[in-house]
Amino acid sequence: MKKAQQTATTNKDQSPIGITQMAEMLGISTGTISRALNNRYGVNPKTRARVLEAARHYGYVPNGAARQLKDRPALLVGLFFAPYYGPGGEINPGALGIIDQLRAVMQSQRMELRVLHYENNEELKAQAKDVHVGVFFGHFEDSSFATIHELGLPAILYSKRSSYTSQICVLPDTRHCANTGVQYLAALGHERIALVTGPLVETPFQGYREGFEQALREFHIPIVERWLVELPESDCNKDGTCSALLPLLQTADETERPSAILFSSDWLALGGRKAAREIGLRVPEDLSLIGYDNVPLSAELDPPLTTFDIHMPDLVQTITRLAAQLGGHPKSKSAPAPQREMFILPDLIKRGSCACLRPLPSN
């Protein structure tokens, strides 16, 4: 009896630990511990067992302040952002628009979006421990996804692929976009068509190249290697596009330059427009342009830019819903498990930047 009393006294006197301390002891994120303790989706069974055992052993006590849900978000979402930068530090306006809308929609659902940047995997690990779910937006090494998987943090990858089951991929069908763009230009009579993308190691740019070449072959349009412009990371911006296109467009013989160019973003298309204006080419009379993203500015240009609309409201709602499901948002407990890959199908928005080269029918 005396021994039992002594044991009880020892447990009572032992200082309980909080979720942050337990995360540090186990080397996993606070978000993962929270999901494990609440039996939420997205936690490896072995990890869940480790967390529950540690909670019993160390006498875990929830932080009372963290329970005040009226004052704090129900879910913390870390948006890991790795954009391409312009020479002055500017960023693709299409990417910034997505982030702004994500923040607004998530806030309306008691979710907090934190935009995060990291230089190495150690920084990634440190930042990941402070959020419940991650969203990756930009260009990343595959090692980042392995790191997040090892931490047990569920993640959403926009325009990227992953082999890890805890990571959901939201993929715009850029292959379809390139194919549709070529079909439209071919219908207008264009047979000299160029393509401008970023590095082909990135999923969306690879899709653009594949769809572009496939469509050219279907229409028996020659594939001109020098018109397949793959911008390096440092030049994947408006000014880099302008510099890359000037040598292709500065020729006296119009048959030696493309009559139309397809771009993998509106930002790059603005660079093509700038190059054309610098050497005196008219859009669309001398050069037709098609962008991608449908940023607000594209409709205000003269002429307005033909582009692909990514349906941003639907895209933002999709990412928000997935974040809520993966992070265990109270309103998403009964939702079915999401698909591993979800495709977004952009639509071609025809405006004034593409000219028809076919002659008018004779009366």
Model-derived features with residue positions:
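Flexible loop/turn connectors
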Residues: C242, L246-N363
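Alpha-helical recognition/docking segments in bacterial nutrient-uptake
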Residues: M1-Q5, T10-Q14, L76-Q183, T255
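Periplasmic-binding protein-like
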Residues: G78-L79, D130-F137, A194-V196, D253-S265, ...
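Short beta-strand segments enriched in small/hydrophobic residues
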Residues: T32-S34, L69-G89, Y184, R192-P199
